[in-house]
Amino acid sequence: MASEPRAGPVMPMASLGPGGPAVSRVGLGLAALGRPAYITGGRGRDLPDRDVNALRARTFAVLDAAYAAGVRYVDAARSYGRAEEFLAGWLARPGHPGVVAGSKWGYRYTGEWRLDAGQHEVKEHSLAMFGAQLAESRALLGGRLALYQVHSLTTSTAPTPASRITRAASATVCS
């Protein structure tokens, strides 16, 4: 396990919208760390061991380095495999004040931790998917989840009108 992270100088901060949380202007996305095959395909020399424990340890080390460099915003998504789980484990360790966690819904991870999976995610923007994925994200990240975004919503992929999703999100997130 990585050593206790040292807090370096915090980067300049910015608000995520009016009244939103203050975050570092540079954030860290966990897409390539939360699942064994994504943009890391063909990177066997850089990531020789891709089992769950190895990628969890790698995620913790990267998060420790980012925190020491002043990064205070971390982005995950339900489709990033175990990214939320890894982030939650790292946040549970002492020494990470001021970290803002964000996540996204709209894709379901289907790769089952296999490098050779033909399909790694399925896009779905239904109200049912929103509710299920928000509950999963909250179960993992709890009160540290400060921003929840839709992943790649377009008029052609949204079976539910955006206004209904917006109302559901407002009612769910604000309650």
Per-segment meaning from a language model:
Residues 44-50, 117-175:
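Glycine/proline-rich, positively charged
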Residues 1-104:
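N-terminal binding-site loop/beta-alpha segment at the start of enzyme catalytic domains
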Residues 86, 91, 100-132, 136-138:
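N-terminal entry module detector
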Residues 34-40, 109-113, 157-159:
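Short acidic/His/Gly/Ser-rich catalytic and metal-binding motifs that mark active-site loops
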Residues 60, 108, 168-171:
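General helical structural elements
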Residues 77-85, 109, 154-159:
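Acidic-and-aromatic substrate-binding clefts and catalytic sites of carbohydrate-active enzymes
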